[in-house]
């Protein structure tokens, strides 16, 4: 604490630090990496059962399509409304021939859902290198061959290497459960990667951002909005490439 105070005092001539009061407390020693697991329980999205890898399948859900997920340090348990909105849209559009692009893949839950629904192949991108490990582990947990789901680290919006690796005019479906502001940027890039009449499923959009996302899609001559769905305060916008 003394070193922190000394460092702040060195900054005082350059900025207004105010009173600079300090509080010190002890935090209970817990396994924070794994402690969240007690809150992740099996749940359903329509006819799909999503469960953590360490839980058993509830007897009443044995007839449902099973997806097992352990996100590790990547994002995505499936419990959030935005993920569920995307899953419901994937149910509508995935076919046995679908090539799927999963942007911001995280744990791989959306890509794995697409494969479980019958998609041919998934290509995922994520800024977090942990996503590559998480997806690999979750593919194994779901009995899916690793060659069915490739993941690369990088930003598809502005990284030409990633854009080239993703391929052009290739995908039947793109899905992105990110943030509204990122989707507004992403909708400019995605059209070059999906086929004509390809579907772009988006969520991560809080209701107060719905109009901004709609306006961005409507201003893009490459897309037409085909559906907007809601769950709680969250929104999914689905568009088709013209």
Residue positions per predicted region:
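Conserved beta-strand segments of alpha/beta enzyme cores
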Residues: 21-23, 49, 121, 148-150, ...
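Hydrophobic residues in well-ordered beta-strands that form the structural core
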Residues: 51-52, 124, 202
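Conserved SAM/SAH cofactor-binding pocket of Class I
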Residues: 73-156
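S-adenosylmethionine
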Residues: 127-241
């Amino acid at each position: 604490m003394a070193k922190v105070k000394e460092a702040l005092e060195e900054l005082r001539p350059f900025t207004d630090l105010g009173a600079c009061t300090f509080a010190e407390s002890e935090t209970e020693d817990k396994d924070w990496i794994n402690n969240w697991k007690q809150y992740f329980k099996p749940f359903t999205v329509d006819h799909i059962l999503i469960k953590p890898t360490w839980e058993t399948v509830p007897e009443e859900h044995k007839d449902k399509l099973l997806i097992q997920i352990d996100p590790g340090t990547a994002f995505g348990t499936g419990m959030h409304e935005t993920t569920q909105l995307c899953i419901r849209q994937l149910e509508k559009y995935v076919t046995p021939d679908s090539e799927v692009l999963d942007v911001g893949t995280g744990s791989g839950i959306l890509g794995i859902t697409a494969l479980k629904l019958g998609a041919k192949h998934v290509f995922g991108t994520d800024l977090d290198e942990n996503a590559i490990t998480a997806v690999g582990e979750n593919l194994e947990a779901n009995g899916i061959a690793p060659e069915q789901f490739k993941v690369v680290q990088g930003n598809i919006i502005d990284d030409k290497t990633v854009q080239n690796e993703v391929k052009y005019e290739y995908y039947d479906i793109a899905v992105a459960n990110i943030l509204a502001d990122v989707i507004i940027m992403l909708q400019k890039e995605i059209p070059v990667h999906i086929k004509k009449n390809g579907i772009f499923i988006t969520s991560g959009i809080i209701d107060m951002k719905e109009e901004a996302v709609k306006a961005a899609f409507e201003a893009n001559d490459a897309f037409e909005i085909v559906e907007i769905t809601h769950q709680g305060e969250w929104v999914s916008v689905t568009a088709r490439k013209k």
